[in-house]
């Protein structure tokens, strides 16, 4: 199959993300806003002190409700002390929470600065028969399959070394993305795995009022039958943390304001609960927890924790698709 034919096939069967696309109207429920990512750490204060180093323009160490914290825009990273290093995707079973990250105005320049600072880079393979690299733009362009890589090599195509995405390996093994977009450094996403991306998108929209951007997740659109379950996954592509490649599509995502819950597929399911792992859960806020909890109970959403005091406020914990834990905190 030629490069052109395979490329057309991949575009038809799967999708790439469409940044900040026009959005569908949000469901008519009380507003919920993205609030925080909660991590487990053997040294919360040291973990909180780390993030202002790579992201000095947007992150500051602070505290919130008794937790060591990082404030970045209107979002927080919170840290709970644990006795032993929490499991991540390298040391334990995979959860539905893959990583979180920042948009940066020049990701290659950021990567060079990270290396100069002595920060650990989580490298990726550029091909099944290739080498480890820092950034996606250090690989052949277009997130190619191995077949496409061989065809591009034969034609003399070279990496652009401009923009793209890469990853830091942060405190306790956290994976943190550095992805070029826009002109301002900002925390912008949590990246998820879901066995059925379209089903997850619909769940987030239905129960949490998230918006589904138009054009995102075209391959994750439901068929005429209305069945959101994934029947066909795209072939693996590179760069990839696994030398065997990474199945990227059908992908998708939803937004809470300017924060994206981005989704890649996890064929076969089996994702475990994130509780106690490196990223324990993420959270949204509501102005009236009683109203939100009552609605979610009417919708038969599973509760992991009933309403309880949360510092000077209140919170509850629910379970979403693929066992993801989502906290609902009250912010008046």
Where are these regions (language model features)?
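Short, surface-exposed ligand-recognition loops at beta-strand->loop->(often short) alpha-helix junctions
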Residues: 38-43, 102-104, 192-198, 284-287
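Conserved catalytic-core motifs of GNAT/GCN5-like acyltransferases
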Residues: 58-64, 211-220
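Amphipathic alpha-helical segments
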Residues: 42-58, 110-117, 196-212, 296-299
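Mature N-terminal segment immediately following signal peptide/propeptide cleavage
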Residues: 28-63, 68-69
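N-terminal secretory signal peptides that target proteins for export/translocation
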Residues: 1-4
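Vicinal oxygen chelate
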Residues: 22-29, 112-192, 214-255, 262-265, ...
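Sec/Tat signal peptide C-region and signal peptidase I cleavage site
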Residues: 17-21
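Bacterial N-terminal signal peptides
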Residues: 6-16
């Amino acid at each position: 199959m030629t490069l052109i034919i395979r490329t057309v096939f991949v575009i038809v069967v799967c999708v790439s993300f469409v940044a900040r696309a026009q959005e569908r109207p949000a469901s008519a429920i009380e507003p919920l806003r993205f609030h925080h990512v909660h991590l487990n750490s053997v040294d919360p204060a040291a973990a909180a002190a780390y993030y202002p180093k790579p992201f000095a323009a947007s992150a500051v160490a602070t505290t919130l409700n008794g937790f060591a914290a990082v404030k970045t825009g209107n979002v927080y990273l919170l840290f709970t002390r644990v006795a032993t290093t929490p499991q991540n995707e390298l040391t334990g079973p995979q959860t539905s929470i893959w990583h979180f990250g920042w948009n940066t105005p020049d990701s290659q320049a950021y990567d060079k600065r990270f290396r100069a600072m002595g920060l650990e880079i989580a490298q990726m393979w550029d091909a099944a028969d290739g080498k480890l690299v820092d950034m996606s733009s250090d690989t052949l362009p277009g997130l190619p399959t191995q077949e496409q890589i061989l065809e591009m090599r034969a034609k003399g195509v070279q990496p652009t070394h401009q923009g793209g995405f890469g990853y830091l390996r942060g405190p306790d093994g956290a994976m943190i993305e550095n992805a070029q977009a826009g002109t301002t450094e900002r925390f912008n996403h949590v990246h998820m795995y879901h066995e059925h991306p379209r089903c997850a998108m619909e769940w987030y929209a239905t129960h949490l009022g998230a918006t589904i951007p138009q054009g995102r997740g075209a391959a994750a659109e439901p068929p005429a039958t209305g069945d959101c379950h994934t029947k066909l996954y795209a072939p693996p592509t590179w760069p990839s943390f696994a030398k065997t490649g990474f199945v990227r599509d059908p992908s998708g995502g939803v937004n809470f304001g300017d924060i994206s819950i981005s989704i890649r597929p996890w064929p076969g399911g089996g994702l475990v609960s994130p509780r106690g792992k490196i990223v324990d859960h993420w959270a949204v806020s509501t102005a009236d927890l009683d109203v939100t909890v009552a609605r979610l109970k009417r919708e038969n959403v599973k509760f992991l924790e009933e309403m309880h005091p949360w510092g000077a406020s209140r919170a509850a914990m629910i379970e979403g698709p693929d066992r993801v834990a989502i906290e609902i905190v009250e912010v008046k």
